[in-house]
Amino acid sequence: EDEFGTLYAAFDNMRANLRTQISEAETAKQEAEAAKEQAQAAREDVESERNEMEALTGHLELKAQQYSDALDAAANGDLTARVKTDSMNDAMAEVGEDINTTLDALEDTIADMKAFATNVIQSSDRVNSNAERVDRASKQVSKSINEIFEGTTEQNEGLESAAAEMQNLSATAQQVASSAQQVADTSQSAAKVGEDGREAAQEAIAEMSAIEAETGETVEEINALDDELDEIGEIVGVITSIVEQTNMLALNASIEAAHADGDGEGFAVVADEIKGLAEETKEAAADIEGRIEAIQEQAGDTVETMESTSTRITEGVSTVEETVDALETIVEYTEEVDTGIQEIDRATEEQARTAQDVMGTIDDLTTISQQTATEADTVAGAAQDQSASIEEVSDSATELRQRADDLESLLDRFTVENSAGTGTDSTAAVGDD
């Protein structure tokens, strides 16, 4: 602000000098006019001189106004305005050159300051962005280190627990070996039972197959009986037909006996007896036919039952065969279990020896884990310190950006060319048409 105040003061001095020169020119003009009045007689001689003085005065007034406009524009922030330096007065031309030189220098300075402020803002933003990333990374590292510290602590506890478990494992290895032998004995017994079960199942299959065969024969015999009953039914039908014909003959005989009066009495008695016998025969045939139908219906039910029984026997045979397969598989598995148990017995002995080696390794791991926990705690502290430093850098960058924003706001009131320090050859001069 002091530099701008100095510039403003310089501009004011320049304007004051211009006003002084203008005032002097006015005075000279007045003196010339006075001389004109005093030397009216010599008007022809001084007319030319007076015209020149008026032209010079007008020129000086125009130049002074142009210079004043350029300085006013600069004072209002427009540093692109320039003045024409050609003048009828050498001093005035020199003043114009000084004004242009001053404005060039001031414009370049303001442009450089604007570029500097922009660079500071961009750099501050990048610093802030990088600081935020580093801060996040530092916090993540700190979090990871804390997790490592907690993990190593849990690991120590786990290793101590593992050491105790290994001692228990070593102690129980012999118990496992003893139990394995007992299981081996039990598996052998199970194999024997499975073998006996397989033999019994095979005998059951043989018996069920025999029953299935006998059932099939029974079904065939019942079907044959049904066929014979059908034939008997046909015979009964024939008898029924004969009885109906006999009834018809007896009826005709009775009619003829009635026509013969007394001579046909004995014949009528015989006809009645034949008719009665035919009725009894018809009733007996109907009874036989009913019984045959009942026997056939019962035989049909028996056949269905026998066929269902045969189907179930077949399914039972299939189930027993599956049971035999399962028993054979159990026997095989039992033999494999027996072999596996023998291997377990050998493995438990090896496990007991290995457990001692593992306990030594666990002790070494516990020591390393404790060292890791200590180092992780140290690194976590350093990461926290780094995070605090990054936050300070971020705060400083934020403050720097704020100040750069303030500077840019102050510089925005000045109008300059786009590129800083490039000169003013292309800048329009004040007073151009």
Curated annotation (Swiss-Prot):
UniProt-listed GO biological process terms: chemotaxis; signal transduction
Show which residues constitute the signal peptide. none
List all Basic and acidic residues biased stretches. 26-48
Composition skew (Polar residues), residue ranges: 384-397
HAMP domain ranges (all copies): 58-111
Taxonomy, top ranks, is: Archaea, Methanobacteriati, Methanobacteriota, Stenosarchaea group, Halobacteria
What family is it from?
A: Belongs to the methyl-accepting chemotaxis (MCP) protein family.
What is an example of a Pfam family matching this protein? Answer: MCPsignal
Gene field: htrII
Q: What is this protein called?
A: Sensory rhodopsin II transducer
